[in-house]
Amino acid sequence: MGLFSKIFSNARKPEGFFGRMMVNGMNGGSHARMAQWGLSFVDVAQEAGVLDIGCGGGANIARLLRRCPKGTVQGIDYSPVSVKKSQEVNAAAIAAGRCKVQEGSAATLPYADGEFDLVTAFETVYFWPGIEECFRGVLRVLKEGGRFLIVNEDDGLTGNNEKWEKMIDGMHTYTPDELRTHLTAAGFRDIAVHTNDQHHWLCATAAK
């Protein structure tokens, strides 16, 4: 495996030196711009309880904390490298009791029913096993009327996804129609999918 492939194969589950490089890169550049774009499609109450699944380098947790200054944000990721980085980035909020980051999987969310006002998933659903079952888990931990936000770097419509899917084991880039279908099957309502024509970003929102 070449250097380029070694680095980007860490996108699914960052590990070791290249994993640390990956999570650092997740926190800036186009990833930051895309996250801000995606967040423009949801309102976050000042006292909201938020969960960020696949929290990566922790920058989106920090953005969410700023959006709900009287609320709390929890993060979960199955990469110990990502958990450690997210904890470092959000150390002050963790010390203040406004943030918690833990290791875990989107397939078995360790939270109570109806715990969160908002659940976010930035650049992560590509890797979720059994996508509809994972979505049902998200639905379970949301409060009635709570929102689910998905933000993906690729809308699956350009053909670029084939290159990444060959390079990154277990990756699937969902098209807008695929996401609508899976969210509907999982029990979500008020589903909206937005795309960015310039960058081919994708954002989906859905309600419980």
Feature locations, PLM:
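Conserved alpha-helix/loop element of class I SAM-dependent methyltransferases that forms part
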Residues: 29-48, 63
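Class I SAM-dependent methyltransferase SAM/SAH-binding core
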Residues: 49-108
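A short SAM/SAH-binding and catalytic strip from SAM-dependent methyltransferases
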Residues: 118-131
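A generic alpha-to-beta junction signature in SAM-dependent methyltransferases
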Residues: 42-44, 67-68, 142
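A short acidic, Gly/Pro-enriched loop at the edge of an enzyme's catalytic core
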Residues: 107-118
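A short glycine-rich, Lys/Arg-flanked "PGG" loop and its adjoining helix->strand segment in the class I
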Residues: 132-144
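C-terminal alpha-helical "lid/dimerization" subdomain adjacent to the S-adenosyl-L-methionine
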Residues: 2-6, 10, 15-24, 28, ...
